[in-house]
């Protein structure tokens, strides 16, 4: 591959780990694992993210497209309907989105974020 075509081989990437900020945690003990594949200049990021079960508040300042690879999650906008996400589902969250993310079954997604 060249520097113009980048594969998604996470076995060659050291993952970052984390969790929701304590003030955003609603339930459970969710743990995040993120394999950042691309951090291009100009504020575009892509990679693979995985989370274990739990529920927390989310507030988006950025634009994100993602594709669920495995698992089951529920994203609910404040005052809106629940969006049930399973393998194969895709979603875009725009800046200003506020709500909750609940991982029911460990979920893995690939993503592209524009800040």
Write out the residue ranges for each language-model feature.
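Short, conserved beta-strand element in jelly-roll/cupin
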Residues: 51, 61-75
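Short hydrophobic/aromatic-rich beta-strand segments that constitute the beta-sheet cores
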Residues: 58, 75, 109-111
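Short acidic-glycine-tyrosine-enriched beta hairpin
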Residues: 79-95
